[in-house]
């Protein structure tokens, strides 16, 4: 009888020990995977910024980013630069914190983002000792997802030099075409603002008129996603978004 009890105890001990070992292995692997995912997310974001900046030099993404890109923080209300570590700042996280953000009214919330952080990140593209472009991150709701993009702007604060979407979950082949290079190429050379400095980008269903300064073709079969792109620009070019900052850029506030 005692022998049977000893055998049961040994079996239980082995089972418990194996369970603990397996738990430790799984936990360690999960932590390692999360860390790797974070690193990959940062690398992918940097890659998109380098791409939209038009940097074609050979080298690793981290090297090119460090050499040519300077992240800076701005106060959305004034458009002024503010002190702080822009590299460590998480604007998405800040927008969810009532102490670091504001809740938008229905009238203000054209892009359907609900809250906007008080502080934003912009990326200055360096050319020697001067700034050649600025990159502003924008996001807005599409049909199925929040769509995140980077828009590169010349130092006139008005002319688009590139756009790239780095996170979206729209329908492949329809709204997902926001990532199509041919569609994105339409934005190059477009003017963000009209002569009165009001947001002027227009995503036109059926196609923008030839030679339009502000118009780009809507996405075929993806009206709601196209509307989301329109509303994204309407919000982020306005007074609640990067409007005040881009006005300072337009007035020569970079170099």
UniProtKB/Swiss-Prot annotation:
GO cellular component, one term: plasma membrane
Modification FMN phosphoryl threonine occurs at: 223
Pfam families documented for this protein: FMN_bind
Keywords: Cell inner membrane, Cell membrane, Flavoprotein, FMN, Ion transport, Membrane, NAD, Phosphoprotein, Sodium, Sodium transport, Translocase, Transmembrane, Transmembrane helix, Transport, Ubiquinone
Enzyme class: translocase
Listed cofactors: FMN
Keyword Cell membrane: yes
Subcellular location: Cell inner membrane
Spans traversing the lipid bilayer: 12-32
EC nos: 7.2.1.1
Membrane topology according to the record: Single-pass membrane protein
One MF annotation (Gene Ontology) recorded for this entry: FMN binding
GO terms (BP aspect): sodium ion transport
Subunit structure: Composed of six subunits; NqrA, NqrB, NqrC, NqrD, NqrE and NqrF.
Family: Belongs to the NqrC family.
Listed HAMAP family: NqrC (MF_00427)
Descriptive protein name: Na(+)-translocating NADH-quinone reductase subunit C
Taxonomic source organism: Vibrio anguillarum (Listonella anguillarum)
């Amino acid at each position: 009888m005692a022998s049977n009890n000893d055998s049961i105890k040994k079996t239980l001990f082995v089972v418990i020990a194996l369970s603990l070992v397996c738990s430790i292995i799984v936990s360690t692997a999960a932590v390692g995977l999360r860390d790797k995912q974070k690193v990959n997310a940062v690398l992918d974001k940097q890659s998109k910024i380098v791409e939209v900046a038009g940097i074609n030099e050979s080298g690793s993404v981290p090297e090119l980013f460090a050499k040519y890109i300077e992240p800076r923080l701005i106060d959305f209300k004034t458009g002024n630069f503010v002190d702080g570590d822009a590299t460590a700042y998480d604007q998405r996280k800040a927008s969810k914190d009532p102490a670091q953000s504001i809740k938008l009214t229905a009238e203000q919330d054209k892009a359907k983002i609900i809250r906007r952080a008080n502080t934003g990140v912009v990326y200055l593209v360096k050319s020697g000792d001067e700034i050649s472009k600025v990159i502003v991150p924008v996001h807005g709701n599409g049909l199925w997802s929040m769509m995140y993009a980077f828009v590169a702007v010349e130092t006139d604060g008005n002319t688009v030099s590139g756009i790239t979407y780095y996170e979206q979950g729209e329908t492949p082949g329809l709204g997902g075409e926001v990532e199509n290079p041919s569609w994105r190429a339409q934005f190059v050379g477009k003017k963000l603002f009209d002569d009165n400095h009001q947001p002027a980008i227009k995503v036109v269903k059926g196609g923008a008129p030839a030679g339009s300064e502000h118009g780009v073709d809507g996405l075929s079969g993806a009206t709601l996603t196209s509307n989301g792109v329109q509303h994204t620009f309407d919000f982020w070019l306005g007074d609640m978004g990067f409007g005040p900052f881009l006005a300072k850029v337009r007035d020569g506030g970079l170099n």
